């Protein structure tokens, strides 16, 4: 199935907003990677086509919760239950935030909740829908590691570079740090130790990452990262957004 993978901009969407996109025939390989406004994105084909929206790692925060026994994942009370579990940990009003549970979450078992600005996400998806590109799924650019090794990702530009750590700490969370000497010192042995994990760096910041970390990096483009994100089991379009993407895509055909 051919897939158009779009990365949502951190700023609010407008007519001139450009989206980095990757076009893939199989979800693994890219046939095109570029940037375009919503009106100029590649036209999709027949029912085999899918649009996937990627939420940037810097737009998300993550919290670990344990759902109470007996709560159904289809319950209309689930959103209110999450608000109750999270309200003392959040800096913003829960009503202004969008929540999404990790795939396979079960009552009585710890699960990750992805959190982002509710109005920003809704406006971003509406802008794509208005341009004829309704996302069938919404996925995180990077997410907590359920298993596997810790990973370091160097992202951005030399002027605004970040280091993202997935599989961070005993809960295997996601941490986002400035890619700077001071921040790396605070990160401690995970980044600067004797056996640190491999670094996956975007080409624009590869030299900076090698200089600061003192070791070679593996190149990984934002297109490759988007392809990997689209293959994940995540779908952030939950609760009030649950029908907006998938249902629109199905209705279209």
Language-model-detected regions and their locations in the chain:
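Hydrophobic/aromatic-enriched cytosolic interaction surfaces used to assemble or bind macromolecules
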Residues: 1-253
């Amino acid at each position: 199935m051919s897939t158009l993978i779009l990365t949502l901009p951190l700023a609010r969407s407008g007519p001139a907003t450009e989206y980095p996109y990757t076009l893939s025939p199989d979800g693994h390989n890219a046939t095109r990677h570029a940037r375009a406004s919503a009106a100029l994105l590649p036209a999709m084909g027949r029912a085999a086509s899918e649009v996937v929206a990627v939420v940037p790692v810097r737009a998300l925060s993550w919290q670990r919760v344990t759902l109470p026994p007996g709560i159904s994942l289809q319950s209309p009370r689930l959103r209110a239950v999450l608000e109750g579990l999270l309200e003392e940990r959040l800096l913003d009003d829960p009503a202004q935030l969008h929540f999404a549970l990790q795939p396979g979450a079960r009552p009585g078992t710890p699960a990750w909740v992805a959190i982002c600005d509710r109005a920003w996400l809704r406006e971003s998806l509406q802008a794509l829908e208005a341009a004829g590109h309704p996302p069938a799924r919404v996925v995180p650019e990077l997410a907590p590691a359920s298993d596997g090794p810790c990973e370091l990702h160097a992202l951005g530009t030399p002027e605004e570079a970040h280091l993202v750590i997935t599989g961070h700490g005993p809960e295997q969370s996601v941490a986002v740090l400035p890619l700077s000497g001071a921040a790396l010192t605070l990160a401690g042995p995970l980044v600067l130790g004797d056996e640190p994990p491999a670094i996956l760096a975007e080409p624009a910041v590869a030299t900076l990452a090698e200089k600061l970390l003192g070791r070679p990096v593996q190149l990984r483009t934002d297109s490759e990262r988007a392809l990997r994100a689209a293959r994940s089991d995540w779908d952030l379009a939950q609760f009030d957004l649950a029908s907006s993407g998938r249902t629109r895509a199905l209705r279209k055909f």
